[in-house]
């Protein structure tokens, strides 16, 4: 009767230590994560982290501000989560690492939104108030999205470039660089967007393919005698002909003022059916084929001999307004890669053209600049007045043809500049702007801005390292920075300029401070409503308010001034330890911040720059609406959990492109489950363990427990090294291996027998639990920076009296004597175990055994392996998870092998081992002697496993 009862309900009669935990197997992340976000906010977890970190060394990751417009996208998620991992890992490494999020609030996109909603005729004051309200609304929307991703920070007190104090400090920063002499006003070709009606920064320009007419145009001889002399001829063989240029911008022809030749390139005078043509000698054959002409070279001369010759404008015969000549200027930038080796120069529409004409004595008033800010020619331009330049292109080609100047016209697809906001083509256009001079030597420093910035690049640590050369090249080759913009919603360049000379008021620095004080109280609206007489009295008769606003890259580029040392100086400090953004920011925020700090402080505003790549789909394609391959982080968070996004980001090498697809997310989810299952096992088997009451001293632990803790401590050292270098994907890879192989596939697998079958309060079981306690402490802390929701959920089960895992620092594992030798020894044992597992699998496949516990093995080993195996004594069988194990000594590695035999004994009902002593106690015929002792006597004695 009793036996039958025991058989039907063995757990009741012969219980094992199978424990449970409130930490569930299923994460149910989409449901639980929002609860954690709410709880973190309600309980002030970020503030608790700050309190716990107070007094530690500071680590400042300065947040590059996203633009306050639109929903967050996957790129935002990558950026914010990487920052969150850095900040959390630095806090846990023993630093005081605050995170102050920020937003970029001024500029064109918001102004466009206001125009769309309310029209273009709003008074400036209304534009301002509506823009502020719109930006505030967008910030709140984005803030919810970032919090949902598990990002902790000072969300209640972010910085905003539109906050009055920040606007005021930007004006003060402008004053600083004026005081040092960097700022000047000048006419220069700048990137100009017709839709924006404003200059653009380099970072606001993108390149896309565009098809334009490409034309070869002849400028007729104006000085035939001088031209003949230049070629060493007594006279030109015929009067017809001229010099030939090639261009992809016909719209610039009406503004032509010069021609450029390379001084050392040899030019040929070619006799053709269209007259004498001057072309670079090495381009003659290609050009004749393109023009469908036959030609004979009459004479040659280097470019230097042709300098200052003049040629008629190609539209001279079409309209008297073009009856002018263009001189030849020499330029090293002319090449013979394409075209004719001759460049036509419209100085108002090209930087090199402008510089060349300036160098040859042209003044600002000499430049022909017929294109207005909206992309149309001035009405007075002959033939094409009032036309859009793009509409004028074909008409100009036709006019050139009628004038007899056109040699060839074709369609040409090329990479061309576009506005990053409007996606429309832009041009270089000479306008009067305020610039920061790259090669200006300031009043208080012997280095130019370019030199100081390049030194700043050299002093900065780059992650990955290739970023250094990229930024260095950009700084080395960039033109002067166009600081001014022609918009309303922006920080004003609050100058008073002389109505006739354009000079700044002599009290400009003092006046800027007065304006800044007003802006600090009332915002940039204070400048809009300011009557000049309030500040400059009767000087208002001679001086007027400058209407330009600052480039928004100056807004964000001076956050090291108006945030780190301004609005949030109590939390932050200068320079920042790290700026972390996408790789496009080498020409954006990294770049503008470097220039402003180099001007203000003579150094970079950061010690390190971390760059991440862009997101692509599973096939490596960029995400776009047209491809329909975009991934919405909000949708993924609601379907799979933000934790899956966090794990995907942490496990991907962010230095390149970050690929995402359903298949990739599926793999990430599987990896997450393995980690979660490991945590569940640890927590369940610690649910009856009280460290204060049950902990076993280190020197009394079983050997495998000492090994597990020593191994985990060694791994943690590696992981912290990766964290310190911002290498997150090796952290994830090693932790996944640790959970699935080192713990799940080995240590926890071996431990199950001891945890489940040893006496509940035995030294052997408490030794295992003590080790698991330390492992859990260590594991949760190294997981917390990226698996934040899960680590917190597990932590609250593990340490319910503690506020949060995020106030902890990385775990100090107990010292294990002889840990290095122990790790080496168990590496050998695990290697042998792998061979035994393989032999057991082969025996199972051959139907010689069922489970591994049905087997008895004999391990033939030599040398160190033999010594390691025999040192375990009878505990070897627990490590191999067999019912019996013996070791046979052999001479060398070649003789090593594993013999597997099925046990001839009965299976214990409780521990499932096959043992000779099953049934040795008549009252318990299905129980082995080991289980009998563990249940009813003093329990078995183990030393190793």
Curated annotation (Swiss-Prot):
PROSITE patterns: AA_TRNA_LIGASE_I. Keywords: Aminoacyl-tRNA synthetase, ATP-binding, Cytoplasm, Ligase, Metal-binding, Nucleotide-binding, Protein biosynthesis, Zinc. The keyword Ribosomal protein does not apply. ATP binds at residue 625. A motif ('KMSKS' region) lies at residues 622-626. It catalyses: tRNA(Ile) + L-isoleucine + ATP = L-isoleucyl-tRNA(Ile) + AMP + diphosphate. GO terms for molecular function: aminoacyl-tRNA deacylase activity; ATP binding; isoleucine-tRNA ligase activity; tRNA binding; zinc ion binding. Its cofactor is Zn(2+). Its EC number is 6.1.1.5. L-isoleucyl-5'-AMP binds at residue 581. Binds 1 zinc ion per subunit. A motif ('HIGH' region) lies at residues 66-76. Gene3D superfamilies: 1.10.730.20, HUPs, Valyl/Leucyl/Isoleucyl-tRNA synthetase, editing domain. Zn(2+) binds at residues 908, 911, 928, 931. The keyword ATP-binding applies. One of its GO terms (biological process) is isoleucyl-tRNA aminoacylation. GO terms for cellular component: cytosol. Catalyzes the attachment of isoleucine to tRNA(Ile). As IleRS can inadvertently accommodate and process structurally similar amino acids such as valine, to avoid such errors it has two additional distinct tRNA(Ile)-dependent editing activities. One activity is designated as 'pretransfer' editing and involves the hydrolysis of activated Val-AMP. The other activity is designated 'posttransfer' editing and involves deacylation of mischarged Val-tRNA(Ile). IleRS has two distinct active sites: one for aminoacylation and one for editing. The misactivated valine is translocated from the active site to the editing site, which sterically excludes the correctly activated isoleucine. The single editing site contains two valyl binding pockets, one specific for each substrate (Val-AMP or Val-tRNA(Ile)). PANTHER family: ISOLEUCINE--TRNA LIGASE, MITOCHONDRIAL, SOLEUCYL-TRNA SYNTHETASE. This is Isoleucine--tRNA ligase. The gene is ileS.
